[in-house]
Structure formats: C-alpha cells, structure tokens
Amino acid sequence: MSFTLAIVGRPNVGKSTLFNRLVGKRLALVDDQPGVTRDLREGAGRLGDLRFIVVDSAGLEIAEDDSLQGRMRRLTERAVDEADVCLFVIDARVGVTAADEYFADILRRRARHVILAANKAEGRAGEAGAMEAYALGLGEPLRISAEHGEGMDDLYRALVPLAEAFEAQNVQQAPETDVAVEDGDDETEDWRPSESKPLQIAVIGRPNAGKSTLINKILGEDRLLTGPEAGITRDSISVSTNFMGTPVRIFDTAGMRKKARVTDKVEKLSVADGLRAVRFAEVVVVLLDVGIPFEQQDLRIADFAETEGRAVVVAANKWDLEEDKPEKLKELREAFERLLPQLKGAPLVTVSARTGKGLDRLHNAILKAHEVWNRRIPTARLNQWLSTMTEAHPPPAPGGRRIRLRYITQVKTRPPAFVVMATHTDKLPDSYQRYLVNGLRQDFDMPGTPIRLTFRDQGTKNPYKDKASKINQSGALSKHKHRQKPKGS
C-alpha cells in the first residue's frame, strides 16, 4: 500500500519529531527553535504493515507572501494539495491558537483527507488542549506523543481504511513493472541508473550559490525554497525526478560556511546533515558562484567530496551574468587545475540555474563522472600498462636497492581502487605514486574521479612463482607416470 502523508501545522508543534518516528531514522532536524524545517522533505514511512511516503513540511505561519515565512507557507500549501492525507498537528500543551484555526479552515477547503493530531498530549498538561481541538471541526483528535511514541496505534487505525482505498485505486492505475530480464543481458551494466536504483546526486556549495534554484529548474517546479537570504535551506532535502531521461535522486544540502562563521546551533546541524548527504551520493556537484569562485570554503567542500571517494562535477553558476565568458572560462580552468590537483580532469561546466542554460552540459558531465566512477579495467590491460609506465620511467633505486613493481590489479570500483605488488614499497616516493595515478587517469580515460592506489610489499616474492612451480611439478609428474612401465612387463 502506498500513499502520501503530509505532516502540517504551526512551527514547533513536533512535526519533524513525528516525521523521524515514522521513517525510523533521524532524517529531519529537530530543535526547540521554531521554524527549523524550511523545505519539504520526503521519507519512506512505516507504521505496522503500512508503507507510505511521508512529507515533513515547514511550519505554517501567517505572513506576507513575499517574506521567507510566506514562501514557506506556499510550499506547505503545495504539499497539502499534492498529499493523499494531511496529518494536522497541534500542540496540546499550548492549546488551539488563532493560527491553528486559520490553517484548519485552509485544510477543510484544500485537503482530500485530514487527520487531526494533538501532540505532546501525554500527562495532564495536554488534556485541556486535546479537548479544545474538537472545536476545529476536523473530527476527533488523536492524542499522541511523537517524542515518546504514544498514540501510534491510533494513527495506524485511522490510516488503514484510507490506505485500503488508495490501494484499490492504485491497482487500476499501476504501470507494468517487474519485467523479466532476457538471458544474455550484460550483468556488468547493473550499476546504470534505473527507476528502482536512481543515480544519487548531492548538490553542495557555499550559502546562496544557487543550489535550490538549480534543483527547482531540473524539477520544473518550485519544490525547494529559493530567495536572496543566504542559508534558507537548512535540512539536506532529497527529491526524486527524471533528469533528461535519467532517473535521479538529488540532495540539496545546506550551504557550508567556514566553521568560524557557523555559530547558530541549527546551522551547525544542517552542515553536518549536508556532509552526510555527500556520503549517500554517488556523484557530488560542487556548485560555485561564478562571481566569487574557488574561495577557501569551495576548496574544502570539493576536497571533502574527493576524500569521501565520490565522483565530482564542478558547476559554475550564474553564468548568464558573466560578460566576458571566454576569458572567465579560461580563468576558471586555470584556477581549477592549480587549486584542486587531486581532482585533475574533473568536469567543469557552466550553468545558469535561473535560466536553465547549461543543464544539458551538466547532465552529460554527471553521467560521464558516474560511468568513470564505476569503471572496471581488465587485469591484463593494467599489467601491460604498468610495464609500459615502468619502462618509460623506471622507479628509483634508493641506496642501490631497485624497487620492482611486479603486478597490478583493480580491487574495487565506486571509486576505482588498485593494488600494486612491489618490493621496498616504503622507499617509493610520493612523486612516483602521483606519476602512476596521473597515468591511470590519462590512459584509461578516468578524469576527475578519485583513484585509490595502494602498494603491497612482496619482498622478493613473485606472484606467479608458486603457481608456475605447481604447474611444472604437475607436468613432470604426469610425464613420469606415462614413462613408467607396468610391473612384470
């Protein structure tokens, strides 16, 4: 059974705590400051045997339309329009407020189904507020405690008949799925994005670089808050969509400021949330403001993504505002190669999140980075390459002891990782390791993706020695048996 449940209500009534309880993870920021959730965020909800999409919304506030709170209210109203069920949460300890009455009227007019929940109703402190909730005209309120899990069985019973009705409706509208795969399909292609396994992308950057605007342009709707206020995205929001034919799940992260400037408690939580989003991503898009590119924080963000082993694409936003584009592009490429040598060759694309120009370039760069991140190179080709590299530039011989690179193999993908069997690995200089990594990038067309290269000291061992010895012994024994004459002949 699948349906969408939107949690709505005033700020600080416990919506995000309830969201976290329903998804079974700490996905939404929770704090006692009002207005911590500023965007819509989705999660996979679970209650008993019910499975559904749960949406955590910004707090409903009466505000002017052009204010930040006004834009938050419009986003929440959109969630109400799109949801199958709205769970309207009030604070039982505070009681029914004028804002509750105002938004209850909106829900009566706009929502398909409304369930009223009086949160924080545990103990006597919430009794009066729970009784007041009857006056909202939305039916009997459920008395719950999102923090302690009380009342979840009542919520389950309220959802079951609705879920069954949605299930009957979905059966009629469901597309064909679980199509059998024919024999002979290439199993090595299973990493390619699909509806069941969308490509996961994190968009990171400094505050107000245009991350939410870019994602809204990809989505074709104002799903995420945008505006002139730096840092209006606080949570790491993930949304699923089809980006030019590619199924993707995109994380819009909170803007990452320098640590010295991160003083607000909630903003510290948001930055940590953004860093977690990088770990969930396959490709990380580092979004720069072309007017002030490659500031110290941009470099730290890109370096963090590389350290985490993610494929990286650098996108310079607000390109529509740049007058001398050829000269600016030349400057960007030079600065990129000089300041981020660890991401040598990573795609650098220019975009305008406002107009949508350059989205095709960004899409192609993301797909290329993802393909390289999943690259698998045959061992035979690697060893031919290693032989060529060592002949062209032999390893040094510190103290007259020659370093021998005997064998290389790929041990991992996502990102590509290689192991070289060698002698005296402790004497191999970093410069020679960089020579090999750069060679792998260039010769196997792996720009930008992190490459992990480790060296395993074999001493004087030859990886083929034991195998060759066994083969020779087996051959000699076989010949000996054939030469033996039967006794008594």
Swiss-Prot record:
Disulfide bonds: none annotated. PROSITE patterns: G_ENGA. GTP 2 binds at residues 205-212, 252-256, 317-320. The keyword Nucleus does not apply. SUPFAM superfamilies: P-loop containing nucleoside triphosphate hydrolases. Residues 454-469 have a biased composition (Basic and acidic residues). Residues 478-489 have a biased composition (Basic residues). PANTHER family: GTPASE DER. HAMAP family: GTPase_Der. This is GTPase Der.
